């Protein structure tokens, strides 16, 4: 099994697209990239810990390749927005691909270069590619949020879904 970590704005919106893929064993919401051990949601939202909201994905590379996960990641984000994602603003919502191996780093960098060269976006691709840091699980009420709170999830992801349809369909 391998591990992938992606930050793409609100972690609520990043779980479902990955959970629906064959070869995914788990997708958990959490926090990474900051300086405070085991932060709370309130601390991360206060923008004082340096963490991003992210998802940790455990996957079987025999069933789904890391490259495919990176491609799916791009299609869930606005890779031209370094200051958050959609209605969620701030460093804690910035887009980051966290790599756990040098091979993941190479794949992510190649994919980013290909996306930039594709001309899909007029602006530069600003998603950063950074080494994975400790990943802290978010509180239980954040796990599987789209299943537990479908109406609130739909409301909170409406702007994201509109952008994705316009730019990735």
Curated annotation (Swiss-Prot):
Catalytic activity: L-methionyl-[protein] + [thioredoxin]-disulfide + H2O = L-methionyl-(S)-S-oxide-[protein] + [thioredoxin]-dithiol; [thioredoxin]-disulfide + L-methionine + H2O = L-methionine (S)-S-oxide + [thioredoxin]-dithiol
Organism from which the protein derives: Streptococcus pyogenes serotype M2 (strain MGAS10270)
Active site (UniProt): 10
First-tier enzyme category under EC: oxidoreductase
Record GO biological process: protein modification process
Recorded family membership: Belongs to the MsrA Met sulfoxide reductase family.
Keyword Oxidoreductase listed: yes
Name by which UniProt lists this protein: Peptide methionine sulfoxide reductase MsrA
HAMAP family to which the protein is assigned, alphabetical: MsrA (MF_01401)
Function, as annotated: Has an important function as a repair enzyme for proteins that have been inactivated by oxidation. Catalyzes the reversible oxidation-reduction of methionine sulfoxide in proteins to methionine.
Protein keywords: Oxidoreductase
The protein's Enzyme Commission number: 1.8.4.11
PANTHER family, sorted: PEPTIDE METHIONINE SULFOXIDE REDUCTASE, PEPTIDE METHIONINE SULFOXIDE REDUCTASE MSRA 2
Lineage of producing organism: Bacteria, Bacillati, Bacillota, Bacilli, Lactobacillales
């Amino acid at each position: 099994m391998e591990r992938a970590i992606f930050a793409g704005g609100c972690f609520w919106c990043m779980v479902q697209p990955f959970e629906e893929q064959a070869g995914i064993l788990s997708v958990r919401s959490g926090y990474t990239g900051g300086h405070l051990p085991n932060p709370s949601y309130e601390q991360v939202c206060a923008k004082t810990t340096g963490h991003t909201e992210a998802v940790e994905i455990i996957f079987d590379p025999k069933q789904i390749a890391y490259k495919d996960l990176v491609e799916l990641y791009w299609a869930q984000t606005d890779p031209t927005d370094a200051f958050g994602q959609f209605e969620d603003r701030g460093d804690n919502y910035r887009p980051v691909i966290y790599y756990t191996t040098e091979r993941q780093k190479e794949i992510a960098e190649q994919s980013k270069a290909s996306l930039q060269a594709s001309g899909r976006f007029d602006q530069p691709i600003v998603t950063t590619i950074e080494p994975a840091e400790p990943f802290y699980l978010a509180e239980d009420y954040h796990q599987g949020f789209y299943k537990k709170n479908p109406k609130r999830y739909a409301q909170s992801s409406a702007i994201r879904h509109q952008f994705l349809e316009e730019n990735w369909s």
